[in-house]
Curated annotation (Swiss-Prot):
The UniProt record lists the keyword Cytoplasm: yes
Positions with biased composition (Acidic residues): 317-333, 804-820
Subcellular localization, as worded in the UniProt entry: Cytoplasm; Postsynaptic density; Cell projection, Axon; Cell projection, Dendrite
Gene name of the encoded protein: Mink1
A Gene Ontology molecular function term of the record: protein serine/threonine kinase activity
Upper lineage: Eukaryota, Metazoa, Chordata, Craniata, Vertebrata
UniProt protein name: Misshapen-like kinase 1
Residues the record lists as Phosphoserine modifications: 324, 326, 644, 720, 729, 745-746, 750
Organism: Mus musculus
Post-translational modification: Autophosphorylated.
Biased composition (Polar residues): 600-610, 673-685, 891-905
This enzyme's EC code(s): 2.7.11.1
Catalytic activity: L-seryl-[protein] + ATP = O-phospho-L-seryl-[protein] + ADP + H(+); L-threonyl-[protein] + ATP = O-phospho-L-threonyl-[protein] + ADP + H(+)
């Protein structure tokens, strides 16, 4: 059978010159559907030989591709392992229709390898058959590769078998892109499960290349298909598989039954780097291919197998007479199987049916004939009976007709009634719909009117606030000018007034100071403070105060005039947490000129009560300046600490700042106090008439994107050198802290280090109100008399604060691992710094079996690194007396005194850790850690960084204070250096298993609020690890605690509404001690929004923004203080081009607000002022949708630069979409969660490992490998504690937490 088309070159082929197939080939039946047409079983008319005929419509666009395919088939199909090309024909069509091209090729009657595998028991071929088929495929590929042709589509469906078990390749070369023999193309790349990684990379990146060795990878996947019934990843969506193939390790055989030769062959074929993959010639010499039984035996075995499978298929198909292809042919044609080579003549099935029909008709005709003959015989025998019979039949027919007519009329009547009922029902529905529509329109009009009214009201409110801001900004400018004019004069007055011999460490302004010597602004502030004190302060009413003047800022402790005079004239303190009896330090920071001050009504009148934390005047070289033991009792025992609110602006405290003391008979201005359990716990009686300062820190885990150097430079300073025999250690502490803080990010106001205005926070400048620029430069110490009794705690409702200054109080930081109770945690000894965790190292070890009285680092003990001086002032935990309640809801008691002045040794507390619900995560069995220990080295000398404690003159009194130790707990104070044991992070988990999946969590004080699929619970981390159910049958997707606002913000419920719960209401659900709170509604919604996907709380200055991602819009709300006390709409951006999945807000250079959001396409920005939306970064190399993980703003960039994390990558860009670093962060695997933690690092949780990386460079700092794959999810973090959850099969979850080494946090 010759080739009907002449052997011409590609350019010379003329499709119109091809012959018509009529009389040469005829079509028998369809065996498959292709994209461009159908594949038929055909037959040569003269010889009866079978052929596969692909019928395609010829269009002008595809004519060149068809010519190229014909040329390829003619050139390279003459090989024993490639289906032979017989010829091409053109079947002419009427004008206006496309002609049909018939491509005639060798017919492989046994079907494809995929068919064979599917019809095999167990869906797996024997190893001998697999080796034989692989060898034949390799021979065909060797032929193609020798002619520089890449098949590009090796898979089971393109490897066909003949009746004699010969193996033939089909659909190679250009045809792989043009069509699929016996199957249609699903996507532009076909099914990707057999594709090599380099081919996929070439689809993603046009610059990538690949060669003929991509066919070797496809051969390896086909071998797995023959062994296991399907290729790897076949249960996934094709686009998902396309994404995973280049990223996953090479697939392997699942079963262990296969020989080593076979597994080695597959491993060799599936080498991911195609340059290392062997060519076909080498694989033909591979033992698995070379060492085979004789070909005859294998082919006989295969033929028997083919025959058996055909018989099975024949039994299934014996009731089917015709076959037609279906659209799902590519999935199901293998099940149907190939028809037998013994052909049914066309029309045979039709003849069979016709024959059966004729037989049936003959049978019925014979029966009718018999009945007619019987009737004639009866008629002849009895004519009268016959007449009667006819009349009877006639009467019966008449009655039947009447009955039929009656039935028809009845049916018509019923149909008419039914139609009437339907019409009435339809009319009623229309009326109901119209009524509903009218009602909805009325409600919509009312809502629109209400919305307009609210908008006008909010607009008027914002205009009033803006006017107040402008007035106070102008007032602040005038104060700055006055201070600049008077600064030199004040310094001269100070030097004249203070003689060297009379210098004291603390300056007391008493009656001897002439008020005329003060600047005008100081007198005005003093006057306002006095008015507030008289009006608001209950202390002022109970105890008359003398009108002692407040000191001006310029009257500081003696310092060299040169360096100090170069300090910017207007400075502001670090934003403190308002509340009663807080120990505050006014760290001054240059105030930017564009700062928008807060309203005067808040900044001048809401002065918080303050206690004094005094600074030494150690910077003066004059020995007379050293304090003497006769220093005022108010100055003793005070603790200096830096407010470590992550949203505050101040740099680290100056080593030598000025200090002022308010006289003990003058009370500061009084404001509504925050009466929480923390505050009441510190109402303790003190010896010497001095009250320990309280340090409470405000924090919000969602807002920790600022430069850590500004927040962590904790300076440890004594109150008085005269009572400080170990003063040298304090100097060492100061040096150590200074060494562990970057000078460029934490400018310290000292004579040797001048403040630089440009060294500002990385987040856009957050200038505070001028209240802090003025009022909080005065650090006040309020003295208490010795006989003053501690105040009892107020009712539970009072524990929650309504202060607008506090974001969330971090009373605990020992995180439940033997930490003090909440009430005592903030006392100076138990906790002198809001970031105690960041300067001490705590390792909680296995809690199961602990020796009795181990004094050193061991299981069940909390080892806190301290210097010997601090040992003296250690305060142990106070038992709160409520053993079954979490600390966040318990009142606190006064500490008891120990006459010996030392903390007595206690029994080992191993059982207590078990009672708290803590177990070892098993850190040495579940997680294998690989950490670069260099990042966890402390930043100072070889000494450990001590916990700041009260020292000095009040140290003896404080040493006598100890707390009732919680039952069984131990705090082991070990002065030896145990850093070597605690350099690496520790992982622990809570024994409690949650029945449903944990979706989110947030720290509420010391305890953890946990949101699951089925409700909200509180995990008591300070007590026995008990779990309290708060809200049931409601899904909680995301949450944040704002303790200062008494709020828990959530996305919850089936409709994903943004709900705000009141913490006082949640607290009362545990205590049940306030009926008034129970009567109130415990939550409210923010707006009428449904379908919230994500939100972010962002604090700028004193404004708290709430940015919310909805289905196709972003809403921005801002917190409005009293009398509104709610989140109010600020901006709305609807009809965004992409659906926001992740959202954040930045303030560029302290001036421009921008919303940054991530979508499935990339990352985008919206300018808040103009509303313009634009793309920041679109990962064009990923053609499928992406999953955005995190938007992280980099430190020291004024909110302009960020790290965008998505999929398993991260890029550094600025807010205008420009790449700023030639670095792409690459995770080791696809993370399920990515989070920025306070140590200036990012963590990624994957199924196989937890990775810790530097946020600045993407450098890998540490890895925790899981012993088994598990799904982990980040929950929240605070200081050096990171909480995450594991989700097991069945939906059960457990809470883990990782304790990072605190020294690494100080070593930025």
């Amino acid at each position: 059978m010759g080739d009907p088309a002449p052997a011409r070159s590609l350019d010379d082929i003329d499709l119109s010159a091809l012959r018509d197939p009529a009389g040469i080939f005829e079509l028998v039946e369809v065996v498959g559907n292709g994209t461009y047409g159908q594949v038929y079983k055909g037959r040569h008319v003269k010889t009866g030989q079978l052929a596969a005929i692909k019928v395609m419509d010829v269009t002008e666009d595809e004519e060149e591709e068809i010519k190229q395919e014909i040329n390829m088939l003619k050139k390279y199909s003459h090989h024993r392992n490639i289906a032979t090309y017989y010829g091409a024909f053109i079947k002419k069509s009427p004008p206006g229709n496309d002609d049909q091209l018939w491509l005639v090729m060798e017919f492989c009657g046994a079907g494809s390898v995929t068919d064979l595998v599917k019809n095999t028991k167990g869906n797996a071929l024997k190893e001998d058959c697999i080796a034989y088929i692989c060898r034949e495929i390799l021979r065909g590929l060797a032929h193609l590769h020798a002619h520089k042709v890449i098949h590009r589509d090796i898979k089971g469906q393109n490897v066909l078998l003949t009746e004699n078990a010969e193996v033939k390749l089909v659909d190679f070369g250009v045809s792989a892109q043009l069509d699929r023999t016996v199957g249609r193309r699903n996507t532009f790349i076909g099914t990707p499960y057999w594709m090599a990684p380099e081919v996929i990379a070439c689809d993603e990146n046009p610059d990538a290349t690949y060669d003929y060795r991509s066919d070797i990878w496809s051969l390896g996947i086909t071998a797995i298909e023959m062994a296991e019934g399907a290729p790897p990843l076949c249960d996934m969506h094709p686009m998902r598989a396309l994404f995973l193939i280049p990223r996953n390790p090479p697939p392997r055989l699942k079963s262990k039954k296969w020989s080593k030769k076979f597994t080695d062959f597959i491993d060799t074929c599936l080498i991911k780097t195609y340059l290392s993959r062997p060519p076909t010639e080498q694989l033909l010499k591979f033992p698995f291919i070379r060492d085979q039984p004789t070909e005859r035996q294998v082919r006989i075995q295969l033929k028997d197998h083919i025959d058996r499978s055909r018989k099975k298929r024949g039994e299934k198909e014996e009731t089917e007479y015709e076959y037609s292809g279906s659209e799902e042919e590519d999935d199901s044609h293998g099940e149907e199987g190939e028809p037998s080579s013994i052909m049914n003549v066309p029309g045979e099935s039709t003849l069979r049916r016709e024959f059966l029909r004729l037989q049936q008709e003959n049978k019925s005709n014979s029966e009718a004939l018999k009945q007619q003959q019987q009737l004639q015989q009866q008629q002849q025998r009895d004519p009268e009976a016959h007449i009667k019979h006819l009349l009877h039949q006639r009467q019966r027919r008449i009655e039947e007709q009447k009955e039929e007519r009656r039935r028809v009329e009845e049916q018509q009547r019923r149909e008419r009634e039914q139609r009437k009922l339907q019409e009435k029902e339809q009319q009623r529905r229309l009326e109901d719909m119209q009524a509903l529509r009218r009602e909805e329109e009325r409600r919509q009009a009312e809502r629109e009117q209400e919305y307009k009214r609210k908008q006008l009201e909010e607009q008027r409110q914002s205009e009033r606030l803006q006017r107040q801001l402008q007035q106070e900004h102008a007032y602040l400018k005038s104060l700055q000018q006055q201070q600049q004019q008077q600064q030199l004069q004040k310094q001269q007055q100070q030097q004249q007034q203070i003689l060297p011999g009379d210098r004291k460490p603390l300056y007391h302004y008493g009656r001897g100071i002439n008020p005329a010597d003060k600047p005008a602004w100081a007198r005005e502030v003093e006057e306002r403070a006095r008015m507030n004190k008289q009006q608001n302060s209950p202390l002022a009413k109970a105890k008359p105060s003398s009108a002692g003047p407040e000191p001006p800022i310029s009257q500081a402790s003696p310092s060299p005039p040169g360096p100090l005079s170069q300090t910017p004239p207007m400075q502001r303190p670090v934003e403190p947490q308002e509340g009663p009896h807080k120990s505050l330090v006014a760290h001054r920071v240059p105030l930017k000129p564009y700062a928008a001050p807060v309203p005067r009504s808040q900044s001048l009148q809401d002065q918080p009560t303050r206690n004094l934390a005094a600074f030494p005047a150690s910077h003066d070289p004059d020995p007379a300046a050293v304090p003497t033991p006769t220093a005022t009792p108010s100055a003793r025992g005070a603790v200096i600490r830096q407010n470590s609110d992550p949203t505050s602006e101040g740099p680290g405290p100056s080593p030598n700042p000025p200090s002022w003391v308010r006289p003990d008979n003058e009370a500061p201005p009084k404001v509504p106090q925050r009466t929480s359990s923390i505050a009441t716990a510190l109402n303790t009686s003190g010896a010497g008439g001095s009250r320990p300062a309280q340090a409470v820190r405000a924090s919000n885990p969602d807002l920790r994107r600022s430069d850590p150097g500004w927040e962590r430079s904790d300076s440890v300073l004594p109150a008085s050198h005269g009572h400080l025999p170990q003063a040298g250690s304090l100097e060492r502490n100061r040096n150590r802290v200074g060494a562990s803080t970057k000078l460029d990010s934490s400018p310290v106001l000292s004579p040797g280090n001048k403040a630089k205005p440009e060294d500002h926070r990385s987040r856009p400048g957050r200038p505070a109100s001028y209240k802090r620029a003025i009022g909080e430069d005065f650090v006040l110490l309020k003295e208490r008399t010795l006989d003053e009794a501690p105040k009892p705690p107020k009712k539970a409702m009072d524990y929650s604060s309504s202060s607008e200054e506090v974001e969330s109080s971090e009373e605990e930081e020992e995180e439940g691992d033997g930490e003090p109770s909440e009430g005592s945690r903030d006392t100076p000894g138990g906790r002198s710094d809001g970031d105690t965790d960041s300067v001490s190292t705590m390792v909680v070890h296995d809690v199961e079996e602990i020796s009795g009285t181990q004094p050193s680092y061991g299981g069940g003990t909390m080892v806190v690194q301290r210097t010997p001086e601090e040992e003296r002032s250690l305060l142990l935990a106070d038992s709160n007396g409520y053993t079954n309640l979490p600390d966040v809801v318990q009142p606190s008691h006064s500490p008891t005194e120990n006459s010996k002045g030392q903390s007595p040794p206690t029994k080992d507390g191993g059982s207590d850790y078990q009672s708290r619900g803590l177990v070892k995560a098993p850190g040495k069995s579940s997680f294998t850690m690989f950490v670069d220990l260099g990042i966890y080295q402390p930043g100072g000398s070889g000494d450990t960084i001590p916990i700041t404690a009260l020292v000095g003159g009040e140290g003896g009194r404080l040493d006598q204070l100890q707390f009732d130790v919680r039952k069984g707990s131990v705090v082991n104070v070990n002065p030896t250096n145990t850093r070597a044991h605690s350099e690496t992070p520790e992982i622990r988990k809570y024994k409690k298993r949650f029945n449903s999946e944990i979706l989110c969590a947030a720290l509420w004080g010391v305890n953890l609020l946990v949101g699951t699929e089925n409700g909200l619970m509180l995990l008591d981390r300070s007590g026995q690890g008990k779990v309290y159910g708060l809200i049931g049958r409601r899904r909680f997707q995301q949450m944040d605690v704002l303790e200062g606002l008494n709020l828990l913000i959530t996305i919850s419920g089936k409709r994903n509404k943004l709900r705000v719960y009141y913490l006082s209401w949640l607290r009362n659900k545990i205590l049940h001690n306030d009926p008034e709170v129970e009567k109130k509604q415990g939550w409210t919604t923010v707006g009428d929004m449904e379908g919230c996907g994500h939100y972010r709380v962002v604090k700028y200055e004193r404004i708290k923004f709430l940015v919310i991602a909805l289905k196709n819009s972003v809403e921005v709300y801002a917190w409005a203080p009293k009398p509104y006390h709610k989140f109010m709409a600020f901006k709305s951006f609807a009809d965004l081009p992409h659906r926001p999945l992740l959202v954040d807000l930045t303030v560029e250079e302290g001036q421009r607000l921008k919303v940054i959001y991530g979508s499935s396409a990339g990352f985008h920005a919206v300018d808040v002022d103009s509303g313009n939306s634009y793309d920041i970064y679109i990962p064009v190399h990923i053609q499928s949708q992406i999953t955005p993980h995190a938007i992280i703003f980099l430190p020291n960039t004024d909110g302009m630069e960020m790290l965008l994390c998505y999929e398993d990558e991260g890029v550094y860009v600025n807010t205008y979409g420009r790449i700023i670093k030639d670095v792409v962060l690459q995770w080791g695997e696809m993370p399920t969660s990515v989070a920025y933690i306070c140590s200036n690092q990012i963590m990624g949780w994957g199924e196989k490992a937890i990775e810790i990386r530097s946020v600045e460079t993407g450098h890998l700092d540490g890895v925790f490998m899981h012993k088994r794959a598990q799904r982990l999810k980040f929950l929240c973090e605070r200081n050096d504690k990171v909480f995450f959850a594991s989700v097991r099969s069945g939906g059960s979850s457990q809470v883990y937490f990782m304790t990072l080494n605190r020294n690494c946090i100080m070593n930025w």
